[in-house]
């Protein structure tokens, strides 16, 4: 399956923990489940025009939820923590700190 850079990066994670990590030049994104670290690195460098130093990924299994007698499951997702090279920053997040 051919993934474009915009297919790989789904959305940013905006939580208290991820905002605190921005002080250390680390940014968190929800990414495509099939994307590997090399693809994620290339996508972030292409979309945000920055230099990536490190990529850490985590896979999460969706929780089983129940509403009345109906049982369902939330979607699985993959999260990537991107460490940028010294002196780089993503402008999209600058106003949020």
Swiss-Prot record:
One GO cellular component, as annotated: ribosome
Molecular-function GO term, any one: structural constituent of ribosome
Domain of life: Bacteria
Protein keywords: Ribonucleoprotein, Ribosomal protein, RNA-binding, rRNA-binding
GO biological process, one term: translation
InterPro entries linked: Nucleotide-bd_a/b_plait_sf, Ribosomal_uL23-like, Ribosomal_uL23/eL15/eS24_sf, Ribosomal_uL23_CS
Metal-binding in keyword set: no
Task of the protein: One of the early assembly proteins it binds 23S rRNA. One of the proteins that surrounds the polypeptide exit tunnel on the outside of the ribosome. Forms the main docking site for trigger factor binding to the ribosome.
PANTHER family cross-referenced by the UniProt entry: 60S RIBOSOMAL PROTEIN L23A (PTHR11620)
Similarity remark: Belongs to the universal ribosomal protein uL23 family.
NCBIfam families reported for this sequence: PRK05738.2-4, PRK05738.3-2
Quaternary data: Part of the 50S ribosomal subunit. Contacts protein L29, and trigger factor when it is bound to the ribosome.
Protein's UniProt name: Large ribosomal subunit protein uL23
Naturally occurring in which organism (per UniProt): Clostridium perfringens (strain 13 / Type A)
Lineage, opening ranks: Bacteria, Bacillati, Bacillota, Clostridia, Eubacteriales
Primary gene name: rplW
